[in-house]
Regions:
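Conserved N-terminal phosphate-binding loop of PLP-dependent enzymes in the Aspartate aminotransferase
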Residues: 1-381
Length: 381
């Protein structure tokens, strides 16, 4: 399983580190575009189907900037997010439902003066009726979501959910932001590309620059034209204005060199084919162990991402997934595997295969998982 912060692994030794080191010697930030920016921009448009892109230093910042744009375009204050979501440290997303179904600050996260009742509407993933009710208030600027929830266990979209989500957001003139920072493990164009989603804005981060902090956000032609219509006009070359977006190091030369190497050499069809093959092997091995031991658990895979959760079926929403978790068992599994040479990602039971993963790595994980669960089942309850 690969490191969580760079789920595709670093660029290959031949090209990626060389490109990063070469650019570092020439200068990491120039406050000017480089030729790499032209290549990366064209590749993002080709790969993800959106024509316009900006670079940030984290997916959190990308989400923040897009939300600011959506508020600017709509004149509305609120954003809809789904319960147990993950969009980095975006303030509007740091909420959850309590036992009474009320929206409250997420456990362990101080509200920091943010009055979430004025910024956020919270609904459960896959609940189109609740989503429609939230949008009907007329105060929502955007819906921000992963296409497949990944940070509370894995929650797949129900059949028809994405079609309904897109129809409702269009009907209520609400921007749809798809955050694929995790689900880029689904393929070279992410879950959206594999399943034909049509977001207004697209966010991607974490793994796209071989470990160099980087993220991007893209937008459709229609949204770009709306942005141009409301931004102040100025004469290029005679005035400078960042309009409150970006930052001094956003889009720097080192980021673009690393992104070019990663897209060209790591996020390739061949690499994903290898990752998918080993992830399927991992999924099959975990499922066989669960069936052999008659454990009421299940395993889910999307692309190169595999997760096992302590319930008989895939959860329908984040709340259901959250209630199925068991911190003590999770800690035991992680520590048992770690002490024997297998490092799972640090949250829940999720594994990512990467281009460097080998079949023997998967076999080791499966054998150790079987040993660990066997020992646990032999202990008195």
């Amino acid at each position: 399983p690969a490191a969580y912060g760079a789920p595709l692994g670093p660029p290959p030794t031949r090209g990626g580190p060389h490109a990063i080191a070469r650019q570092a010697r020439r200068g990491s930030t120039l406050m000017l575009p480089t030729e790499d920016s032209l290549w990366v921009g064209a590749e993002l448009a080709r790969r993800f189907g959106l024509p316009y892109w900006q670079v940030t230093t984290s997916a959190t910042d990308a989400n923040r900037f897009v939300l600011r744009l959506c508020r600017m375009l709509s004149g509305r204050d609120k954003v809809v997010v789904f319960n147990c979501n993950y969009h980095g440290s975006v303030d509007e997303s740091q909420v959850e439902f309590d036992a009474a179904g009320r929206m409250v600050p997420r456990a362990g996260v101080h509200p920091n003066g943010v009055r979430h009742a004025t910024t956020t509407r919270l609904v459960e993933f896959n609940d189109l009726d609740a989503l429609e009710a939230a949008l009907a208030h007329g105060d929502v600027a955007a819906v921000l979501t992963e296409p497949f929830m990944t940070n509370v266990g894995m929650v797949p979209p129900a059949e028809g959910f994405h079609a309904g989500l897109r129809e409702l957001t269009r009907r209520h003139d609400v921007a749809l932001i798809i955050d694929e920072t995790h689900t880029i493990s689904c393929g070279p164009a992410g879950y959206s590309g594999a399943h034909g989603l049509e977001p207004d804005f697209f966010v991607l981060g974490k793994c796209i620059a071989g470990g160099i902090p980087s993220a991007v956000w893209g937008c459709s032609q229609a949204q770009a034209e709306r942005i141009w219509a409301v931004l102040p006009h100025f004469r290029p070359g005679q005035a400078i204005n960042h309009f409150g977006f970006g930052g001094t190091l956003a889009g720097n030369a080192l980021q673009l060199a690393a992104m070019r190497a990663t897209f060209a050499e790591v996020m390739t069809e061949d690499a994903y084919r290898h990752m998918f093959q080993l992830a399927a092997q991992l999924e099959a091995g975990v499922r066989a162990t669960l069936e052999e031991l008659r454990l009421p658990w299940h395993v889910t895979r999307i692309g190169a991402r595999v997760e096992y959760l302590f319930m008989t079926h895939a959860p329908r929403n984040g709340g259901e997934a959250h209630h199925a978790r068991n911190g003590l068992i999770e800690a035991c599994l992680h520590l048992y595997l770690l002490n024997r040479g297998v490092l799972l990602t640090p949250f829940h039971n999720m594994a990512l295969t990467c281009p460097a993963t080998r079949a023997e790595d998967v076999e080791l994980h499966d054998r150790l998982l079987r040993d660990c669960l066997g020992e646990l089942l032999e202990r008195p309850s």
